[in-house]
């Protein structure tokens, strides 16, 4: 394989492309959340808890955010330290709820999320293309997740 073929193969690699995209998206997100004292993923968790004010279990949060339960616990611990969420025991179960302080913080969280979208719109300039790409990427991700879920169930 000559250098040109190697370069073409490298540039068309799905893993490399997705990794590059993640770095760009993550940079947009971190810049957008720089003014508030939480990271983007914590912001997404707060949005989830704001929508489900009755509280959610670690497993419910894990399923919604598609992250490991141990990661959820770490995120919740950080948000508890800041006073934005609290854990409440109900019998053997534990639920995480957004606090009044967290609810007061939500306008800042939504503004930060809007900034991320605005950065995409500014960079891409075609909102229809942005919506189509988002829908396509969501579908792509769901297909991969379904494939992985089926393989796990086989084992």
Which positions does each model-derived feature cover?
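C-terminal regulatory/oligomerization modules of transcriptional regulators
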Residues: 1-6, 111, 115, 122, ...
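Short amphipathic alpha-helical segments with heptad-repeat character
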Residues: 15, 19, 23, 66, ...
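Charged, amphipathic alpha-helical coiled-coil/dimerization segments
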Residues: 77-135
């Amino acid at each position: 394989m000559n250098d040109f073929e190697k370069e073409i193969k490298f540039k068309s690699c799905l893993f490399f492309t997705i990794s590059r995209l993640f770095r760009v998206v993550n940079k947009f997100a971190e810049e957008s959340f720089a003014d508030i004292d939480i990271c983007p993923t914590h912001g997404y968790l707060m949005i989830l808890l704001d929508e489900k004010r009755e509280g959610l279990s670690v497993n419910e949060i894990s399923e919604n955010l598609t992250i490991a339960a141990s990661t959820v616990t770490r995120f919740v611990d950080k948000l508890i330290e800041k006073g934005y969420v609290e854990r409440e025991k109900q019998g053997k179960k534990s639920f995480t709820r957004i606090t009044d302080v967290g609810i007061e913080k939500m306008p800042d969280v939504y503004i930060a999320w809007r900034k991320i979208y605005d950065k995409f719109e500014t960079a891409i300039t075609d909102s229809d293309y942005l919506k189509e790409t988002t829908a396509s990427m969501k579908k792509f991700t769901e297909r991969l997740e379904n494939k992985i879920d089926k393989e796990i169930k086989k084992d």
